[in-house]
Amino acid sequence: MSQLLQQLGTDNEFIRRHNGPASSEHQHMLNTIGAETLQQLIEETVPSSIRLPQPMQLPHGLSENAMLAELKQIAQQNTLNTSYIGQGYYNTHTPNVILRNVLENPGWYTAYTPYQPEISQGRLEALLNYQQMVMDLTGLEIANASLLDEATAAAEAMTLCKRGGKSKSNLFFVADDVHPQTLAVIKTRAKFIGFDVVVDHESNLDSHDVFGALLQYPGTTGEVKDLTDLIAQAHTKKTLVIVATDLLASVLLKPVGEMGADIAIGSAQRFGVPMGYGGPHAAFMATREKLKRSMPGRVIGVSIDSKGNQALRMAMQTREQHIRREKATSNICTAQALLANMASFYAVYHGPEGLKTIARRVHHFTAIVAKALQTAGFELEHQHFFDTLTVKTEQQTDILYTKALASSINLRKFDTKLGISFDETTTVSDLVTLLAVFGIDNAECETLSAEVGKDEFAAIPKHCQRTSSFLTHPVFNTYHSETQMLRYLKKLENKDFSLTHGMIPLGSCTMKLNAVAEMLPVTWPEFGGIHPFAPLNQAAGYTTLATSLKSMLCEITGYDEFSLQPNSGASGEYAGLIAIQRYHESRGDAHRNVCLIPSSAHGTNPATASMVSMKVVVVKCDENGNIDMIDLAEKIEKHQENLSSIMITYPSTHGVYEEQVREVCDMVHAAGGQVYLDGANMNAQVGLTSPGFIGSDVSHLNLHKTFCIPHGGGGPGMGPIGVKSHLAPFLPGHTENGVQGMDYAVSAADLGSASILPISWAYIAMMGEMGLTEATKVAILNANYVMERLRPHYPVLYRGTNGRIAHECIIDIRPLKETTGISEEDIAKRLMDFGFHAPTMSFPVAGTLMVEPTESEDLAELDRFCDAMIAIREEMNKVEQGEWPLDNNPLVNAPHTQVDLMSDSWEHPYTREVACFPSSQSKDSKYWPTVNRVDNVYGDRNLICSCPSIENYEE
């Protein structure tokens, strides 16, 4: 290729779109830092002992158009049959107003988990709607704001039964009509937490002494039956009962809460979220009031702000793993907020009457096919059903199944039966084509409809028909035209801060660019329309994508094999520790159960270790934030016989590259342990070092951090795990289509949240080796630039040997609080007035702020943030000097709202301009918090987790 063609080519052009600072700005930043070149900065920051000896072997970066063309070719390898498989996954219509204004909208998908409620009221309201929807449809008192998938929700519910119940038993019951993928995940969780599982017909529940039971309603084979007496009998033996249920079925069926269920779980996928070959989708959990403080996952509650106005927040956070660590009830962090929002908006848009129409149509089509099949001489397994039929096909099973495939139809095959599940996308012409497979040609569906319509709900027992009202809150009965819905979505979006407004400098969260080109393929039907349990040859595109992505990730990490199954970082940690424990078992070392964890670790680490019955032993950190090598040696010697592993994060959670990391790995290996390297900070490794090169045995990667899957306001996430070859046999399997066997599943689908994998593939493909390495270097450049600008004004807690930091820095507010009285929370809230999301507060050290700018923020935005922080420091000086009283200044009163600006009274010693327009940039483009500082204590003491009455909104 000629030099001119190279100059005019589009390869690698995405790199400058992704990385914020222009190359012409690097020198100014380096001058501020005190380095002559970017390479010098890297050499002073990353220890030479761990730097890769040669570049990664990855292709050069593709242009956006070239990447999309290649990915489209991969997508077109998938075959889109009409799916009647069911088993918890259904085709659905995503309302276009939700598709365009939520799923495809960076105002929704680039926001962070709503830990800062003052700038998150929109998605908090959407998630509260989700909770209300689940509570109404299940008939239970409280619900959480989503879990990862139905199978993991069932596993969480099992542990909740043990925690919240009074039974002394260690046995858990699973009905034999539960989805097989759910049973598989339950078995994995039970094995490693120490429970026994019995699978039996639900009628035999009373013959077992169990602490909890999981039933399915309707069952996986479609049967609808009243569970009231069964549940009541279980309660006499102190057994808590979980029922996995279907939200659309619950529109017509008696809700499980009215049957006495203690816990309801399930998936909200069919409420407008594509199947996506398994995910992501929002699972739900609802419980009785008595179990609320033990329930896993995030819960949205109603509180008030400092002015007494209604404000929403995440409630009961002291339950969560980042607080309780090894004593946490769950390791859940990221769930499925974006998908929960989509499901809640689906319910808002359709309303109760719209949902009834959809449910009636699905049931009616099921009844039509049932009538036609029975008339033709086929026998049904069950006479009572909602949307699923199981047809006894005996010797014809394989013939009919193959005939269906020839007609581009997927049925669910049992040994001598075929399952057929219907959904809202089913049409009359679909029924005609389907019935032809069973030898019923030119079926008269209109005639059949008239016959079935004489008793529309004959297939639902009278005592199983819903009589109670649901979704009565005005929010579900108002926004039914597209204009109304569009404006409601926009109103909520406008309340929230996202990357569309400015930098989100959250340490340990890597809030980088989620490029549009990376996001586009998520909505392609070739990726969205495939059932996760379709025959593998129909998912050739997904197989190609997964193989390619795993190969890329192996090259980036230095591992030998990957599993893409874990659908969150916490799930990846769990899968990784299971792999370690299975490895030890295979070598006759099942007694190895001690997990060493540095005191600086994220709370998920000890919470996950506890989930696999490990004994957590904390290793001290020294005054520089590094692992205390003397304490480590003592702990290894003390626990050598039982040492399973160590969990470390690299660079450390303190934001530095620890010089002795290889020595740490060697010491643990010498004692027979394995090294788990948490991939949360992989954004500071790519292209410069790697977990495998450092000496780690297994890591999870947060694809929603380093590899550009958006945070979605609290999910979706992806946490695939990479392993060295000796751990590869112990990666999770799956009961359906599993490439690693059938056992030890950690998610409902083998590829986890498969439909968002194209995002990470696209990012790597467009960046290439050069771009990925450059991104890491720029992330380090940006972080050190911010540190050097702030260091004259704020103490920086930890730095490396040469005074450098990795990709994030910790600012110590504790000494400033002693002299000024201003806390890290005051600074965080004041940043909102300047147009910024707060850094990470009080993690990993209480009383600090951790800042991670990522490589995507340009110099102007970095300066805007630094200027804001310096201005805040000057405001703190005014408090310290007595110019402003400690109880009445712009920091303790932050954030300020438009209502504050327009208030008739102003009883503050600072002006409205200082309050609301503290910088010139805020006058140019102002983001407004919609509530004042939220009262967390009030919210937990007066716990309300349902939609407030309409009067509250009117106020």
From Swiss-Prot:
GO terms for biological process: glycine decarboxylation via glycine cleavage system. Its EC number is 1.4.4.2. One of its GO terms (cellular component) is cytosol. It comes from the Bacteria. The keyword S-adenosyl-L-methionine does not apply. Its cofactor is pyridoxal 5'-phosphate. The modification N6-(pyridoxal phosphate)lysine is found at K705. It holds the Pfam family GcvP2_C. InterPro entries: GcvP (IPR003437), GDC-P_C (IPR049316), GDC-P_N (IPR049315), GDC_P (IPR020581), PyrdxlP-dep_Trfase (IPR015424), PyrdxlP-dep_Trfase_major (IPR015421), PyrdxlP-dep_Trfase_small (IPR015422). GO terms for molecular function: glycine binding; glycine dehydrogenase (decarboxylating) activity; pyridoxal phosphate binding. Keywords: Oxidoreductase, Pyridoxal phosphate. Belongs to the GcvP family. The glycine cleavage system catalyzes the degradation of glycine. The P protein binds the alpha-amino group of glycine through its pyridoxal phosphate cofactor; CO(2) is released and the remaining methylamine moiety is then transferred to the lipoamide cofactor of the H protein. This is Glycine dehydrogenase (decarboxylating). The lineage of its organism: Bacteria, Pseudomonadati, Pseudomonadota, Gammaproteobacteria, Vibrionales.
